[in-house]
Amino acid sequence: MPHFFKLVSFLYQQYLYAKQNPVLKKLKVGEQEDVYLSAATHDTRFNTNIKGHIGNLNEMSWGFIGTGPYTLALNILYTFTGDAQFARTHAFEFRSEFLEKIDSKKSYWMPNWMISNWIIQKIEGEEIYE
């Protein structure tokens, strides 16, 4: 299948997932909305409302140490800040604190205020939970 048709197919699938489940509509860079992780959606390209802006994979997951949770952490931070360097610097730590320990078989909401506070405290160089 030519690349153009693969891209159209991918965008159409993304549209269908978002139409069937509006909370999975991909956030744009700078949109600081709640992050939704859907265990009911088995296609790891569409199981969250976070778009794969940076990194080598579109597949995003949670509940273990690996590239799926790293890619999700990287793109959550990039979506919220628009700063690729910040996202790369802090993605492992974010993954460790928020994504590794949760059950991959369950869906989750990550409130935007929790993510925003974590980012602010990293920028200011403070500990999050004192």
Question: Predicted regions span which residues?
Answer:
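Amphipathic alpha-helical packing elements
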Residues: 31-91
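Residues that form generic nucleotide/phosphate-binding pockets
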Residues: 75, 79, 97, 101, ...
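Short, compact, well-ordered microdomains
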Residues: 88-118
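Intrinsically disordered, low-complexity, mixed-charge
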Residues: 129-130
